[in-house]
């Protein structure tokens, strides 16, 4: 009987060790995969890129098209239902497009990061930039939100989610805002080293090689 119990414990331990890392892509249409076939969105492309690196991960799509930082803060508890170890926070683009007060955007993101911190989750904050037609005062205040919050919360920052893609017609859909499949590939390729570094930090904390 004792031997059977030991075997069950070993099997349970092995199953737990084999469970894929849970990564939550918490954002707006840029993470939701707006306008793209399911296989071409940010989430499946990131999961595929991680698999190519030999990393077993389940990337969970918590992107809601049109969402603002206020909407993200309101639905955060629900989005964490799968208990992710790593959360990629990609919100703020719609705040900028609507010209919302950067102080409000910063406060909402601060609330999101504080809750994730309190739950001991690894965080990768993806930065966003305001549309350049909103004026220097607005864009300066908005663009500073992400590095300021990353420093305050001591979390990893990917400076600009659309780095290498924004304003390039070859990498965007007809609306000029949302990346096409090729654009998403660029986004994932640029962000991947940051995701890998975050995963390495999780493994070190857990005592894994």
Model-derived segments and spans:
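Serine-esterase "nucleophile elbow" of acetyl-processing enzymes
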Residues: 16-65, 75-83
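Alpha-helical cap/lid subdomain in secreted, periplasmic
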Residues: 45, 52-55, 71-209
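Bacterial N-terminal signal peptides
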Residues: 2-13
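Compositionally biased regions
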Residues: 14-17, 119
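Acidic-and-aromatic substrate-binding clefts and catalytic sites of carbohydrate-active enzymes
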Residues: 66-70
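General secondary-structure edge motif
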Residues: 4, 26, 30, 96, ...
């Amino acid at each position: 009987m004792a031997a059977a119990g030991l075997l069950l414990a070993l099997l349970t331990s092995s199953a737990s060790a084999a469970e894929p890392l849970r990564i939550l892509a918490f954002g707006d249409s840029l993470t939701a995969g707006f306008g793209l076939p399911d296989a071409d969105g940010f989430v499946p492309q990131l999961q595929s890129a991680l698999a190519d690196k030999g990393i077993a991960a389940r990337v969970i799509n918590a992107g809601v098209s049109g969402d603002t930082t206020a909407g993200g803060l309101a639905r955060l508890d629900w989005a964490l239902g799968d208990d992710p170890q790593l959360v990629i926070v990609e919100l703020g683009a719609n705040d900028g497009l609507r010209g919302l007060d950067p102080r409000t955007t910063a406060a909402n993101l601060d609330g999101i990061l504080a809750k994730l911190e309190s739950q001991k989750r690894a965080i990768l904050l993806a930065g966003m930039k305001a549309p350049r037609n909103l004026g220097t005062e607005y864009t300066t205040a908005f663009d500073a939100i992400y590095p300021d919050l990353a420093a305050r919360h001591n979390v990893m920052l990917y400076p600009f989610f659309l780095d290498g893609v924004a304003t390039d017609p070859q990498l965007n859909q007809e609306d000029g805002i949302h990346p096409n499949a090729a654009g998403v590939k660029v986004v994932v390729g640029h962000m991947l080293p940051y995701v890998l570094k975050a995963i390495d930090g999780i493994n070190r904390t857990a005592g894994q090689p």
